[in-house]
Swiss-Prot record:
Family membership noted in the UniProt record: Belongs to the NOS family.
Gene: NOS2
Region (Disordered): 29-64, 1138-1157
Organism: Sus scrofa
Record protein name field: Nitric oxide synthase, inducible
Ranges spanned by the short sequence motif DINNN-motif, renumbered to the chain: 23-27
Length: 1157
């Protein structure tokens, strides 16, 4: 018989470090030897290592001397003090000395030159299948080591029982080749394995694990019954209890008992023919396996997959889990009622089912176990991971967050609220759950206990730090040592990948390709693609954007050019200008910001490019610009880039494209992109250029197919704010109209309103002076009614309906996400833009609906750019006017709901201070009316300004606050300011002076000099806020007020830039150059351009700067955020000559009235 004693007395120095250990069976703590206490403070006064080494006892050496030579191996290392690794908490300064790691089993995933610590399932933590038993000479030492560990856990030594058990195990292994654990040993092993699990944050409960011994079962049916008992015990009506069920151990690897599911309870994931996924994407492969094995799918988002159980190595069997054993929690939010509309839920019991318990050389491949949830497991990983349910953006939109702007931190705000909903929902249903902060605190306590009781605590920092909150949890600051002890829970290879099928007819045929063959095929394809791409012409695609639109189009362009070129898409601020000397093809997609400038992420490249004098590499290029034709500097930056590249010697591939957000921007981009692609293929002689299949994105949506849409009756009442919040990704709330006051005199032909909005309650929405209010208007009832009268085969105007679209494969209908369920009348009133002239693409689709051949041909002619632009700028027709011009059009309700553009909000600078009127928001609104056809056409009205002017007190106004971080009062209130705002450009400055007045009256703060430069036509006609300005001057809030009048009888026209030149040159220099003050400009783009030119002239003259130097000077002012512009587009692309016909900006086509559009 093999001698067990050499293993019994095997050197384990760390075990002798403890004079007393924790009793695993009664959970009592014993004291460690004082001289080797592993918990210390990080203090330079601590004893040195050499001193500590001299004080260490040597019990191992004494044991060796007293033992007979026949019972112990003497070739052990010389007695020495235990080596330790010092672990520090950088938050508290406390340190631990880890000695337990010396008992680690094998190596982890790290290599000498690289760390694999962030690999999900490293080989060191995975045990694969076996095809033969573990050899006795390998099993025996592991078995004896476990028996030693087990008996060392008792408070009082049981030497005789210990020695007897060692001898019995040794004999059993010698006789049978394996051994069986006793019931108590199994309980101890399962608990100890949880205690040793480095990736688990909830181990403080390890000793309370309930162990169900199912080693006697022999069939899959018995396995199912044991699992049902487990689920019933663990769920406990929501008061979750931790438990494990252990099935028979592995013998020769051919008779394994395994649960094929990753978790006992998990939701299915269905891969649909069009590539979309219904349910949990993480379960797609396993769900398909269940279907192949005979399960009938239900195609719901939250269908519980059946259990797939394998007994004694036989083929698996399916078992549906009884619904009464699956406790589910519906999700709701304590604040957001709409959260329930997401129809989310989650199961209460997290039970891992596919891991393997290793103990003493034995392997238990079937051992499902559970704890309870930490909230972030559901709220972050299950709901928000992009490869899971991925609800983050939808929640962000419903919250009204700026989901197009990463810097707004919308993801952080949304994920917190999702986690609030998860915790709230579980707690409301009295289901056990733990928040991540409490879990982190409990782990820190557990870790301290472990270092005191056994000198170490294996921990994987990457897994233990929660997926949100990071450094505000204590575990973030804790250094950790990761190692594998025994007993241990290991990962396994998925059972269906290694199972040897006995009945080949039941074997799923879907995955016939062997893994190695698949890897080789993928590798070969990757190498082939790399070589193919490397042989292609390189194309660099640059974008600059403020809203993200240019980036989206640039990436679409990259997808198109990847069909024949080797494209790379970069933001301008990521591009090194030196690469121009290496380019073959350069494509640029950019918007224009402010008064003809570049977006913020294009400033750096613009400055470098425009300073470049020569270029030796004569590459090809093409540019596409995005903008709004209401601005005089329409697409100016794109044209500037085009001209500069041309001057440097680069060769233009196609003319610069222009995408007008008021006129079919997307269609213009598609046409330019396809044309540029074709010319590039010809220019670079791309092989097979006439047979390249371009992406569907560039070929679809050019015709109207009524078979792809249908209307379904719906009974859900419309919540306007909720619908607008979801559609526009804004937090929309309603305010009531308090009052309106016309700020212009009765003699004026125009109207400018002071609109005062109020909210119920003691506190209104949060905003800062200078920020904008976005207002969602309603279309005029006459326009809506006129369109409704011309709809064919439509539902009743007030019948709620929802629009559904047919899937690409035509097999099912999908709810359209563009519009909420509503009546046709509501859609035309609140959601659809019926005043903007139809785009060319919309006219092309309308041509299909014309029953008169002449009208059809006329509509097709209008799709041509030259005819279209002339027709559009002359008539600027509303959609009703189009229907009147082409009376044979047969327009359906589904056409209107699917093809008309979305009505955009209008932005107004807030004209009040929240500190002064906390429950109110004031707006300065110019009511717009104009006639087309050089003043001879029909009268048109501004959508929002006309709607606001028609409201009665207490009427509701849906709105939201938009931040304007670049247009706010100085952080240092002592800095002097110059405010320049003619006409309605005065709007934000009223909020400035009201804020300064409040600070002076209630806080005793006296702000720096504030000079106002205002402009209007005549003092007795349109001098807005004249009395209030004078009052502010009397109270010292405004240091000086200068007004330019442009229509005084018998006097020359004077504008604000004239006042700057004539009266304020010295003040401008003092404020900007000497006192580091701020200058603000608010108004239309032409005024802003003229003011900027005047200021540059003044500065250049005073400081003797050339043109390049003065441009750099103002670039620095903007970089320092001391030159502020709030520009709106009050200029039409066509000129209306009649005096007073064109009013200030509340243009029905303008996305911004007093803000940047």
């Amino acid at each position: 018989m093999a001698c067990p004693w050499k293993f019994l007395f095997k050197a384990k120095s760390s075990r002798f470090d403890l004079t007393e250990e924790k009793d695993i069976n009664n959970n009592l703590e014993k004291l460690r030897q004082a001289s080797s206490s592993p918990v210390t403070q990080d203090d330079p006064k601590c004893p040195s290592r050499s001193r500590h080494r001299n004080e260490c006892s040597q019990p191992l050496a004494e044991t060796a001397k007293k033992s007979p030579d026949s019972l112990v191996k003497l070739d052990v290392l010389p007695p020495a003090c235990p080596r330790h690794v010092r672990i520090k908490n950088w938050g508290s300064g406390m340190t631990f000395q880890d000695t337990l790691h010396r008992e680690a089993k094998g190596d982890l995933a790290c290599k000498s030159k690289s760390c694999l610590g962030a690999i999900m399932n490293p080989k060191s933590l995975t045990i694969g299948p076996r095809d033969k038993p573990t050899p006795p000479d390998e099993l025996l030492p592991q078995a004896i080591e476990f028996v030693n560990l087990y008996y060392s856990s008792f408070k009082e030594a049981k030497i005789e029982e210990h020695l007897a058990r060692v001898e019995a195990v040794t004999k059993e292994i010698e006789t049978t080749g394996t051994y069986q654990l006793t019931g108590d040993e199994l309980i101890f092993a399962a608990k100890q394995a949880w205690r040793n699990a480095p990736r688990c944050i909830g181990r403080i409960q390890w000793s309370n694990l309930q162990v169900f011994d199912a080693r006697s079962c022999s069939t899959a049916q018995e396995m199912f019954e044991h699992i049902c008992r487990h689920l019933r015990y663990a769920t406990n009506n929501g008061n979750i209890r931790s438990a494990i069920t252990v099935f028979p151990q592995r013998s020769d690897g051919k008779h394994d008992f395994r649960v094929w599911n990753a978790q006992l309870i998990r939701y299915a994931g269905y891969q649909m023919p069009d590539g979309t996924i219904i349910g949990d994407p993480a379960s797609v492969e396993f769900t398909q396996l269940c279907i192949d094995l005979g399960w009938k799918p239900k195609y719901g988002r939250f269908d519980v997959v059946p259990l797939v159980l394998q007994a004694d190595g036989r083929d698996p069997e399916l078992f549906e889990i009884p619904p009464d054993l699956v406790l589910e929690v519906p999700m709701e939010h304590p604040k957001y009622e709409w959260f329930q509309e997401l129809e989310l839920k989650w199961y209460a019991l997290p039970a891992v089912a596919n891991m393997l318990l290793e103990v003493g050389g034995l392997e238990f491949p079937g051992c499902p176990f559970n704890g309870w949830y930490m909230g972030t497991e559901i709220g972050v990983r299950d709901f928000c991971d992009v490869q899971r349910y991925n609800i983050l953006e939808e929640v962000g939109r419903r919250m009204g967050l700026e989901t197009h702007k990463l810097a707004s931190l919308w993801k952080d705000r949304a994920v917190v609220e999702i986690n609030v909903a998860v915790l709230h929902s579980f707690q409301k249903q009295n289901v056990t759950i733990m928040d991540h902060h409490s879990a982190a605190e409990s782990f820190m306590k557990y870790m301290q206990n472990e270092y005191r009781s056994r000198g170490g605590c294996p921990a994987d920092w990457i897994w233990l730090v929660p997926p949100i909150s990071g450094s505000i949890t204590p575990v973030f600051h804790q250094e950790m040592l990761n190692y594998v002890l025994s007993p241990f829970y290991y990962y396994q290879v998925e059972a269906w990948k290694t199972h040897v099928w006995q009945d080949e007819k039941r074997r799923p045929r879907r995955k016939e390709i062997r893994f190695k063959v698949l890897v080789k095929a993928v590798l070969f394809a990757a190498v082939l693609m790399h070589k193919t791409m490397a042989a292609r012409v390189r194309a660099t695609i640059l974008f600059a954007t403020e809203t993200g639109r240019s980036e989206t189009l640039a990436r679409d362009l990259g997808a198109l050019f990847s069909c024949a070129f080797n494209p790379k898409v970069l933001c301008m601020d990521e591009y090194r200008l030196s690469r121009l000397e290496e380019e073959q093809l350069l494509l640029v997609v950019t918007s224009t910001f402010g008064n003809g400038g570049s977006p913020g992420n294009g400033e750096k490249l613009k400055k470098s490019l425009f300073m470049l004098k020569e270029l030796t590499n004569k590459f090809r290029y093409a540019v596409f610009g995005l903008g709004s034709s209401m601005y005089p500097q329409f697409c100016a930056f794109a044209h500037d880039v085009d001209q500069k590249l041309s001057h440097l010697g680069a060769s233009q591939l196609t003319p610069t494209g222009e995408g007008d957000e008021l006129s079919g921007q997307e269609e213009a981009f598609r046409g330019w992109a396809v044309q540029t692609f074709k010319v590039a293929c010809e220019t670079f002689d791309v092989r097979g250029k006439h047979h390249i299949q371009i992406p569907k994105l560039y070929t679809s949506n050019v015709t109207w197919d009524p078979q792809l849409y249908r209307l379904v009756q719906d009974s859900e009442p419309l919540d306007l704010n909720k619908a607008l919040s979801s559609m526009h990704a804004k937090y929309v709330f309603s305010m009531r109209l308090k009052s309106q006051q016309n700020l212009q005199s009765p003699q004026s032909s125009r109207t400018t309103l002071l609109v005062e909005l109020c909210c119920e309650g003691s506190q209104g929405p949060s905003y800062l002076p200078g920020e904008h209010l976005g207002v969602f208007p309603a279309n005029q009832p006459a326009l809506v009614q006129g369109i409704l009268e011309r709809v064919v085969d439509g539902p009743a105007p007030h019948q709620p309906v929802r629009l559904e679209t047919l899937s690409e494969n035509g097999s099912y209908w999908v709810k359209d996400k563009r519009l909420p369920p509503c009546s046709l009348s509501q859609a035309l009133t609140y959601f659809l833009d019926i005043t903007t002239p139809p785009t060319q693409l919309l006219l092309r689709k309308l041509a299909q609906l014309a029953t008169d051949e002449a009208e059809r041909q006329r509509l097709e002619t209008l799709c041509q750019p030259s005819d279209y632009n002339k027709w559009k700028f002359t008539n600027s027709p509303t959609f009703l006017e189009v229907l009147e011009e082409f009376p044979s059009l047969r327009v359906s309700a589904s056409f209107l709901l699917s093809q008309l553009p979305i009505l955009k909000p209008r932005y107004y600078s807030i004209s009040s201070s929240r500190d002064r009127t906390p429950t109110e928001i004031h707006l300065t609104v110019a009511v717009l009316t104009y006639r087309t056809r050089d003043g001879q056409g029909p009268l048109h009205h501004g959508v929002c300004s006309t709607w606001l002017s028609s409201l009665k007190p207490q009427d509701l106004v849906p709105c939201f606050v938009r931040s304007a971080s670049g247009f706010q009062l100085p952080e240092d209130p002592s800095r002097p300011c110059i405010l320049i705002g003619p006409g309605t450009g005065i709007a934000p400055f009223r909020s400035f002076w009201q804020q300064r007045l409040h600070e002076a009256e209630h806080k005793g703060l006296q702000g720096g000099r504030m000079t106002l430069v205002f402009g209007c036509r005549r003092p007795d006609e349109d001098h807005l806020y004249q009395e209030e300005m004078l009052e502010m001057a009397r109270k010292g809030v405004l240091h000086e007020v200068h007004t330019a009048y442009s229509r005084l009888p018998g006097q020359p026209k004077v504008y604000v830039q004239d006042l700057l030149r004539q009266r304020l040159a010295g003040e401008v220099l003092r404020v900007l150059h000497e006192e580091q003050g701020h200058l603000y400009v608010c108004g239309d783009v032409r005024m802003a351009r003229d003011v900027a030119c005047t200021l540059k002239q003044l500065v250049a003259t005073a400081l003797t700067l050339n043109e390049e130097q003065v441009e750099d000077y103002f670039f620095q002012l903007k970089s320092q955020k001391r030159y502020h512009e709030d520009i709106f587009g009050a200029v039409f692309p066509y000129e209306v000559k009649k005096e007073g016909a064109v009013g200030p900006p509340s243009d029905p086509r303008a996305p911004g009235a007093h803000g940047k559009s």
